[in-house]
Amino acid sequence: MSIITTAFALSLLATTAFAVPPETPRIELQAERGLGDQSYAPWQVDCPSNVTWIRNATTGLGTGERAYIEAREKLVQPAIEQMMAARGLETPPRTPVIGVALAGGGYRAMLTGLGGIMGMMNESTEASQSETGGWLDGVSYWSGLSGGSWATGSFMSNGGQLPTTLLENLWNIDSNLVFPDDGKLSFYTNLYTETNAKSDLGFPVQITDIWGLAIGSHVLPEPYQLSNTPNLTFSSLPSVVAALGNASLPMPIIVAADRKRREAGELVIAENATVWEFTPYEFGSWAFGSQYKSPGAFTPIEYLGTSVDDGSPNGTCWKGFDQLSFVMGTSATLFNGAFLELNGTDSGLLTNLITAFLADLGEDQADISRIPNSFSNYNSGENPIYNLTYITLVDAGETNQNIPLEPLLVPTRDVDAIVAFDSSYDSDYIWPNGTALRTTYERAKILAEHENTRVLMPEVPSMNGFVNGGYNSRPTFFGCNDTTTPVIIYIPSYPWSFAANTSTYQLSYENNEANEMLLNGMRSLTLNHSVPTWPTCFACALTDRSFMYTSENRSTTCQECFDTWCWAGDDNTTEPANYEPVINSVPPWLIANNLSIGMADAPGSNESTAGTASSGAAKMGVGMGMVALTAGLGLML
């Protein structure tokens, strides 16, 4: 009997006074689900003979991704033509490759990022009226990290429904992620049943598994939530979700980073750590290593968990390791701390389960996700992970690259423009200050030293420069005249209509609060329909590279846009004052440049909150988030 099983059995005995037996014992559950191929646990399959188990990153795009992007382009092209015509702009001579990147930051990031996405959806009446709705149909790639990965997984698995529709009909984010309002026992016993089944097969199980299943039970389609059959794998999405099967949605990418152990035993999450990608087709990285970079590699994600040695399976193959909930949990291991806080609190069902995990793993392994190393003994001369049993992954936001730009910056993907949604907790009052972009730029300089591991990141100002220049309060274009890089359209969160600077650790939101978060995120992209020229300038930035424009041949309209919205290269590095934007206000830069028609003339404004400083909301948000977390921990069963 495993240590997890023993602890769980003891905790059940301690709670029988008010507990009821699990509704479905493990044996019955397996019978219900055939041979286990529909549960969270991986299942054994015959090893295929026609699979390329390792693909070197220097070979370009994988076949699955290439086919998807080719199919996507057929839908993207007419969508972009329509959006350009609506602005009176010329159709690009080639179809631009556009990406969106959603930052991390818990539910705050999920809601703010999906709000920004909603600002690009023609299904949103307000976005359509703001004349930015419809651009999502022109996007080829979508990357998400941590809370942004929850947005990615939920949006994609639900077929691209309007986020406000998901909030109304599916999400149960008003119930705490760790401490649900009701059904606690069934929730925790289901967590045990599913994770123990995976452990029984010899696969590593960690708090990430519990955390991922909890996330999935709040935002994934109901048939795949913990109370039903939590068996939705990332690789199955194109088969299960029609909108992904026919390439009607951008190709999703979820990001994590690796953690290394130095010789002295110190655990390290370096800013130049390896960035790992999960897509419906592959798992891998474009560049391996930290201090020394070498070309990376990819393996079919469908067979992740299979023991592979130098590119060949060791006789037994598996499917089902790539559960979407697990991938989302892996991208957000920072939140394992929500469960770690249970250690040492009042005895309870989940407390004993977590304690068992810690005893089995060691506390230095509690905030990680372990992936069986498919690249064992592959390219051992250059591959720095060739001798590892597991790839150890953490929340990529812990590298300070809190916007997952890197997958969209690799030369192979030929991305022309990236809409970067930033809801990071950078400042004292939980607003972004450009740290994510600056960190990626500094990392790009390191990668540039190695020809096969480059990322094409334009220069951006320092964090102080972001704040002093007001770039963290309104959209800014970066890389405008550096034609070797994509144009980055930076969309920072701003309190257009709501105090969206809530705590990263706020683990539940009332529906009306979540709705306001979505709307505010949308208005950070649409500028609350207060800048008449913005829809045209947004279109210019998204398509600029496909015209091969420079300042010498850009259209008059688009050059005027770039003169207005592009970073001019200034970088005021002096220490700025605390950034404290006012709720329901217009960013001062828009007013100073006579761009805004004023909030009173814009739709959707909420005048009742005008003049409220966001600092109070931030303090209250942090307090409420931590109170909700610690109170729930104290009241555990």
Curated annotation (Swiss-Prot):
Glycosylation sites: 50, 56, 122, 231, 246, 272, 314, 343, 387, 433, 481, 501, 528, 553, 572, 594, 606
PTM text: N-glycosylated.
Keyword Glycoprotein: yes
GO biological process: glycerophospholipid catabolic process
Catalyzed reactions: a 1-acyl-sn-glycero-3-phosphocholine + H2O = sn-glycerol 3-phosphocholine + a fatty acid + H(+)
Domain of life per record: Eukaryota
Listed EC numbers: 3.1.1.5
Extent of the signal sequence: 1-19
MF term (GO), any: lysophospholipase activity
GO cellular component terms listed in the entry, alphabetical order: cytosol; extracellular region
Subcellular location: Secreted
Domain PLA2c, residue spans: 46-572
Keywords per UniProt: Glycoprotein, Hydrolase, Lipid degradation, Lipid metabolism, Secreted, Signal
Pfam family, one: PLA2_B
EC class of the enzyme, as a word: hydrolase
Family: Belongs to the lysophospholipase family.
Job of this protein: Exhibits phospholipase B (PLB), lysophospholipase (LPL) and lysophospholipase/transacylase (LPTA) activities.
Protein name stated in the entry: Phospholipase B
Record organism: Cryptococcus neoformans var. neoformans serotype D (strain B-3501A)
Primary gene name: PLB1
